[in-house]
Design a protein with these regions (language model features):
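Phosphate- and divalent-cation-binding pockets in alpha/beta enzyme and binding domains
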Residues: 67, 275, 393-396, 452-453
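Membrane-integral, polyisoprenol-dependent glycosyltransferases
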Residues: 1-336, 400, 474
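Luminal/periplasmic acceptor-recognition loop/helix of membrane-associated glycosyltransferases
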Residues: 366-389, 399-483
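Generic hydrophobic alpha-helical scaffold/packing signal
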Residues: 259, 303, 318, 371-375, ...
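Signature aromatic-anchored transmembrane alpha helix within multi-pass, membrane-resident enzymes
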Residues: 330-353
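Glycine- and aromatic-enriched periplasmic loops at the membrane-periplasm interface
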Residues: 57, 390-391
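Short, flexible loop segments at the rims of nucleotide/cofactor-binding pockets, characterized by
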Residues: 154-155, 247, 359-364, 418-424
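Hydrophobic alpha-helical transmembrane segments in integral membrane proteins
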Residues: 313, 351-373
Length: 483
């Protein structure tokens, strides 16, 4: 089998895995549903520029990923398959990008195994099925640095312009980090190479114009349409606050991204450190391409380790150079490569099979089953409320507004505030003392609020309609109260 046939077979295999079962995987809370709900509302409103959720404009992420979801919903309908379409598609594109870069830097064998290693590692396969921005950023981030690397090696300005265009798309996907972090990688690399004079050869003035042409129109529109509210929320909270105040304090440990590497790169986690140790003993002279991949693989996780907010997927762009380096260092060890590929492929098949068959029966990560139960009897003018953690997938699937039920003191404490993580609490609230007695009310109780319900609401003529899941530990309860 020639190189093209082998590559084609592997790409078809991974692409099939990335799409397999997506129609059976419900949208989950709390993260996936925010993207899906936003795109659903934008499509319904005919609004394709200003992200909105629960009827409110919100500025959690830039526009590009919402455009992906809107496009998928327009073609396939608002379905689970559509919501997961572009992450799976970009996962396949990421493998093609990895192959192309590795092929230019090394050879076809290294490029082939780079694809196998990346496609079979845990985090890549996981993100291929999640409704998140990370694989879109992965492709644009990789395109930015890959194009720079080739432009630097070959002295062709066209590659630099491609890098700026990809960076602009990265800024439209994730914000300033789509340009600033690749820029930092490039700067560190040039320092390592003692070649800062190269900054004069990478088309900086005209390249920045290309970047601005790609991403500036949307940002200018958002500022003109929403003013300081957009700037303060998007840049202030979702960029500056993330960098300076930890959103998940329990993850703020020095070894966080080291742990993500060993878990996310499994079953290849130990291959690269061992190969690097072996190479270090022989002190090889590193070519410019290998140096660049090493800088890329190190700078990204170190940068995010220095940020206050840690998140498992932030260091994901470093997996592309890591996969290529692993393939390059192990290219002659066919036994290790084959064993890792078999283990990774088998593990991914098992995980996807389990997720496809378990997820529809689960009532915690997705409220789809609760929504289906509600839609059997709930009328348009009925009131839907929730108690406990807001299960946002219920209003997503029912299309019915759902109010977070809480005391006035709790609402005041959770209300959005300037430069506070509370700004993410954009769901509608209803004070407990305003719960109407003359209207049919449906109540979704999340498991953390079971005791609260028993203490404060259980005596109010509530009829239990069902629990989710139907087997095992209860995670959601659905009640109804009629006048």
């Amino acid at each position: 089998m020639d190189d093209r046939m082998r590559l084609g077979a592997v790409l078809v295999f991974f692409t099939a895995l990335f799409f397999w079962g997506n129609a059976a995987l419900p949208v989950t809370a709390p993260v996936e549903v925010n993207y899906a709900q936003t795109a659903k509302e934008m499509l319904a409103a005919g609004n394709y520029l200003s992200p909105q959720i629960y009827g409110n404009y919100w500025y959690d992420k830039p526009i590009f990923f919402y455009w992906e979801l809107i496009a998928a919903f327009s073609v396939f309908g608002v379905t689970d398959f559509a919501a997961r379409f572009f992450p799976a598609l970009f996962a396949s594109a990421g493998l093609l990008l990895t192959y192309a870069l590795a092929r230019r830097l090394y050879d076809a064998r290294t490029a082939f195994w780079s694809v196998v290693i990346l496609g079979s590692c845990v985090l890549y396969g996981f993100l291929a099925k999640l409704i998140l921005t990370d694989l879109t950023l992965f492709v644009f981030f990789g395109g930015t640095l890959g194009a720079f690397c080739l432009g630097y090696r070959e002295g062709r300005r066209g590659y630099f312009y491609l890098a700026y265009a990809c960076a602009g798309l990265g800024v439209l996907t994730k914000g300033p980090v789509g340009f600033l972090l690749p820029g930092l990688v490039i700067l560190v690399y040039l320092v390592v190479r003692r070649d800062l004079r190269a900054l004069g050869r990478i088309a900086l003035p005209t390249g920045l114009l290309v970047l601005a042409a790609v991403c500036a129109p949307w940002y200018v529109y958002m500022y003109l349409a929403h003013g300081a509210d957009f700037v303060n929320t998007f840049l202030g909270i979702h960029n500056v606050l993330r960098a300076t105040v930890s959103e998940h304090a329990q993850w703020n440990v020095w070894y966080f991204y080291l742990g993500i590497y060993f878990l996310g790169m499994f079953p290849w986690s130990f291959a690269l450190p061992l190969a690097l140790l072996r190479a270090w003993r022989t002190r090889p002279v590193l070519d410019a391409g290998t140096q660049f991949l090493l800088v890329w693989a190190i700078v990204v996780p170190v940068f995010f380790q220095l940020m206050a907010t840690k998140y498992p997927t932030y260091s994901f762009p470093a997996f592309l150079p890591t996969a290529i380096l692993t393939a390059h260092l192990l290219r002659r060890n066919t036994r290790v490569l084959s064993a890792g590929a078999l283990l990774g492929g088998a593990l991914y098949l098992a995980v996807v099979f389990g997720a496809v068959h378990y997820a529809p029966r689960d009532g915690h990560f997705s409220g789809k089953a609760a929504a289906e139960l509600l839609m059997q009897t709930m009328q348009e003018d009925d009131l839907l409320v929730s108690c406990g953690d807001y299960t946002a997938t219920v209003p997503y699937y029912t299309g019915h507004p759902m109010y977070a039920l809480a005391t006035r003191e709790e609402i005041a404490a959770r209300a959005p505030k300037a430069m506070s993580w509370n700004s993410k609490n954009v769901m509608p609230f209803l004070p407990l003392d305003e719960l109407p007695q003359d209207r049919t009310v449906y109540l979704v109780v999340e498991r953390h609020a079971f005791a609260t319900f028993d203490e404060t609401l259980a005596g109010g003529r509530w009829e239990l309609l069902g629990t989710m899941p139907t087997e095992g530990r209860e995670k959601l309860r659905v009640y109804r109260r009629v006048p």
